[in-house]
């Protein structure tokens, strides 16, 4: 970025929590750079800082590992932790870029570079703060490391094409942020415009009026999951129906797994325990979908004795074995890599998982009637 974003010093423990910096990196597009705490931190809080680093690793789509060239000794020994992390990322199918820093302080840095390349079977790129000429090669290598399918999945999949008429039903109630639209709505509108679709956006109370104003029925209606029932009852028969949350189930997660998870709702009881996981951090308001609406729908069916826990942000239990079902939000605030890491944890512990929109579609009896699209999951 060319900016002083993090405090940098030779003192261990300078970086405590991961530092996030968003920027535009051409030709990739918008990226977030995460500067983590050192994994060699042996201070009293070191283990907790390393846990934060591991959490950041779950979100990482490309890992950059720094090796200090002025370290003395056999690379296999002095870089043991760095090599462990490189192996960890490879196991997670995450590309790794190795940088050898402080080359101006080590006369034998070329030998070190060759040895690390032998150990990792990866190219190592030398960098030096006093000579930024090597950064161009690093940027080129970074771009080459980006997965070929990065950014290729689209939100609406194969549901629309050039010239299609699409209606978006977006309640602007007490939960809607002041003066702006929520991220899934913004991203969906932008994608539809890029795909040359004709887009009409309405609030729930103007849904029927909006249909009347159209010269033809929309090919696709995308609604907020909370008003699935109302929109289904009033939509034209020929119009496909889905929701932002269902689309994001495929865009950010594993839609087939979510659908199978939703079917396990029918096997819950009043003694079941459910985890509702919200990615964004906000103060819950009246009729919050995760805190009130979905719990109310579940307890209406199975009784008030059902135990429902909530987590938000990056809080997500390592041990999920005590839950009968996990209900994840759409995941718009996190990247797909991180949502899939949550899904992988649930799968490994044999805990069913679904998301908000798929849950509501199942509970309202229209899960087998809505449109999903293909090509994302």
Predicted regions span which residues?
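Canonical P-loop GTPase G-domain recognition
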Residues: 91-97, 102-158, 165-167, 196-198, ...
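Switch I (effector-binding) loop of TRAFAC-class P-loop GTPase G-domains
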Residues: 2-29
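Helical mechanochemical/support elements of P-loop NTPase systems and associated helical scaffolds
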Residues: 11, 15, 19, 45, ...
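Long, well-ordered amphipathic alpha-helical subdomains in the mid-to-C-terminal portions
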Residues: 159-187
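C-terminal effector/interaction modules appended to NTPase cores
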Residues: 179-377
């Amino acid at each position: 970025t060319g900016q002083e974003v993090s405090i940098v010093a030779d003192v261990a423990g300078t970086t405590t929590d991961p530092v996030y910096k968003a920027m535009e990196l051409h030709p990739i597009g918008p990226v977030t750079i995460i500067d983590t705490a050192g994994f060699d931190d042996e201070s009293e809080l070191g283990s907790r800082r390393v846990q934060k680093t591991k959490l950041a690793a779950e979100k990482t789509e490309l890992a950059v590992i720094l090796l200090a060239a002025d370290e003395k000794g056999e690379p296999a020994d002095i870089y043991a932790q760095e090599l462990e992390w490189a192996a960890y990322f490879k196991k997670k199918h995450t590309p790794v870029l190795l940088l050898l820093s402080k080359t101006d302080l080590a006369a034998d840095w070329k030998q070190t570079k060759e040895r690390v390349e032998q150990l990792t079977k990866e190219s190592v790129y030398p960098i030096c703060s006093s000579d930024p000429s090597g950064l161009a090669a690093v940027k080129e290598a970074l771009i080459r490391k980006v997965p070929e399918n990065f950014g290729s999945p689209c939100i609406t999949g194969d549901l629309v094409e050039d010239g299609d008429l699409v209606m978006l039903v977006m309640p602007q109630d007490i939960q809607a942020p002041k003066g702006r639209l929520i991220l899934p709505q913004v991203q969906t509108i932008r994608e539809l415009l890029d795909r040359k679709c004709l887009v009409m956006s309405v609030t729930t109370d103007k849904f029927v009026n909006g249909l009347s104003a159209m010269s033809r029925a929309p090919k696709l209606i995308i609604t907020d999951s909370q008003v699935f029932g109302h929109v289904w009852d009033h939509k034209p028969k020929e119009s496909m129906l889905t929701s932002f949350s269902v689309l994001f189930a495929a865009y950010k997660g594993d839609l087939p797994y979510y659908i199978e998870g939703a079917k396990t709702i029918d096997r819950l009881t009043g003694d079941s325990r459910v985890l509702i996981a919200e990615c964004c951090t906000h103060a819950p308001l009246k009729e919050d979908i995760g805190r009130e609406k979905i719990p109310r729908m579940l307890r209406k069916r199975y009784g008030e004795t059902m135990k429902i826990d909530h987590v938000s942000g990056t809080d997500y239990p390592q041990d999920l074995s005590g839950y009968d079902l996990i209900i994840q939000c759409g995941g718009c605030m996190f990247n797909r890599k991180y949502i899939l890491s949550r899904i992988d944890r649930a799968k490994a512990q044999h805990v069913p998982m679904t998301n908000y929109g798929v849950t509501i579609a199942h509970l309202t009896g229209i899960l087998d009637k809505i449109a999903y699209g293909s090509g994302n999951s």
